[in-house]
């Protein structure tokens, strides 16, 4: 257990407020005291292309110096309305998933994703929390369909466009995340604001189809959970906190052994009902590997990341979390990080599934994700 405690920060993906690394006490604490394994950029961190590249270069260097490993820098860059590196900061406009789906042009989807990926790579960003593979079958859905974040209302089209989008991002050297598992397309409300019950609207066959198809093709880097409640899957907890949904359905039935990242634990659907402490422990216990905390500043001035780490530490010490489960989560995060560093073994980019399947602490695990590396070594961010 003791070797795990200093590495608990590796299970965090945290948002911060600064725009420059030097002399930023919050960012220094996050990278060097909490040792967060991943950092998340928002519009509040983005002023101009050169500024972002300078910020991420400092973050990569500082994390390497403090923690002795690569920092994963992530962003929501779906295109359209959800694009943190947007026109207000001097970047060109981008197409939404809805725009691309309506065009029916898969080549255009791949090219747009490649363009977005190139923008991220130049900015020093490693991980795009995209594409959205929610099937937009509910026209009244406010957060996915209303914001044009779905490729379409039919699973076949979602799979085809997501496949093209993944190919474009991977060609640019950027990691990806399918979201929001097990599906947010049927909801009538927004989990950013409060509790979302999809028991009567979820369509499992439809909503799981993109995950089944893309996982089978070996092109998935990570999967993000949704904060939706479906009593047919779990009568007590929403998906992010549900062992039945993450451990049972996603990892068990669907056979996913790669990284699972939560949606923001500070969203109303989670924070208002469970609190950050309990949510962090429940999520990791359910099978989530990376806890997304969009804002490190709690209303009382404390660091949300530190609260989460301390909650995980206490849960390890009192037996609520098994050391093997935490160790396996750390292994999967290490394997995801390694996907950026592994060169291609052939012109197709297909590699064996060996990397990350053996624990750095000597335990043996099944394949931790897809059987392809994300990125061409030549496409890695220069800051790395």
Segments (PLM) and residue ranges:
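Preference for extracellular/luminal or secreted protein segments
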Residues: 1-34, 243, 252-253, 271-384
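Second-shell residues forming the walls of enzyme active-site clefts
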Residues: 6, 16-17, 22-23, 45-65, ...
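Soluble non-cytosolic domains of exported or imported proteins
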Residues: 25, 103-111, 152-156, 160, ...
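Catalytic domains of carbohydrate-active enzymes, especially glycoside hydrolases
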Residues: 29-42, 115, 122-127
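Active-site-proximal loop/short-helix segments
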Residues: 80, 85-89, 126-148, 175-195, ...
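A generic, well-ordered mixed alpha/beta core segment in the N-terminal half of proteins
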Residues: 89-124
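Flexible, glycine/proline-enriched loop segments at strand-loop-helix junctions
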Residues: 99-107, 146-156, 194-201
